[in-house]
Amino acid sequence: MDTWHDALGGEKQQPYFQEILNAVRQERLSGQIIYPPAADVFNAFRLTAFDRVKAVILGQDPYHGAGQAHGLAFSVRQGIRIPPSLLNIYKELETDIEGFSIPAHGCLTAWAEQGVLLLNTVLTVRAGQAHSHALLGWERFTDTVIRQLATHRKHLVFMLWGGYAQQKRKLIDSQNYLILTAPHPSPLSAYRGFFGCRHFSQANSYLSRHGIDPINWKL
């Protein structure tokens, strides 16, 4: 199994998946603003090929502010103010990765292109309404994504930040993967253990031990 089409082609034919796409399409047609734009909803899969995934960082649902979401968890487009959770991720990187300096932007495309799957478990949201698409059925699809990676790939790193992401641990066989958990990088919880977790250097050490090129976290 080498491609996302191999891994997810059957899932995309399931009635529930077609119902999700139709529900989102109907909301857009009715004038509801939905983020990310339709062309960006599956960006995580477009930028990170199935057979090139090295690490998975799980988010919840997309940013719901104008111009922010572009299909990658925690990432925002160039020119958009860096959100607080991402700024805290950068602060942890600054202490964890030698030579990392906090960039002036929040675009994580360079990580995605190196094999970091930046996966939100819910892939769309209404403008200004956090979790508004939480019940559409996206999680059934993204749970399948996690299961397929955990079944058909080896030596991946899963970064699960916060209780919500950590619920997905049950989908992963920990014997063949590195599962890293910490509080969410949100300002509400980062000081409870996200700061100091050193997940980025741990990920690179694990990848190197298994003969996999480490990730250049610098942006």
Swiss-Prot record:
Enzyme Commission number, as recorded: 3.2.2.27
A GO CC term attached to the entry: cytoplasm
Function: Excises uracil residues from the DNA which can arise as a result of misincorporation of dUMP residues by DNA polymerase or due to deamination of cytosine.
SMART domains reported for this sequence: UDG (SM00986), UreE_C (SM00987)
Subcellular location, record wording: Cytoplasm
Keywords for this protein: Cytoplasm, DNA damage, DNA repair, Hydrolase
Naturally occurring in which organism (per UniProt): Neisseria meningitidis serogroup A / serotype 4A (strain DSM 15465 / Z2491)
A Pfam family it matches: UDG
Source species, domain of life: Bacteria
Main location: cytoplasm
Protein family (similarity comment): Belongs to the uracil-DNA glycosylase (UDG) superfamily. UNG family.
PANTHER family attached to this UniProt entry: URACIL-DNA GLYCOSYLASE
Transmembrane segments: none
Gene: ung
The keyword DNA damage is assigned to this record: yes
Catalytic activity of the protein: Hydrolyzes single-stranded DNA or mismatched double-stranded DNA and polynucleotides, releasing free uracil
Example GO biological process: base-excision repair, AP site formation via deaminated base removal
InterPro entries xref list: UDG_fam1 (IPR002043), Ura-DNA_Glyclase_AS (IPR018085), Uracil-DNA_glycosylase-like (IPR005122), Uracil-DNA_glycosylase-like_sf (IPR036895)
UniProt-recorded name of the protein: Uracil-DNA glycosylase
Catalytic residues as annotated in Swiss-Prot or TrEMBL: 61
GO MF terms, alphabetically ordered: uracil DNA N-glycosylase activity
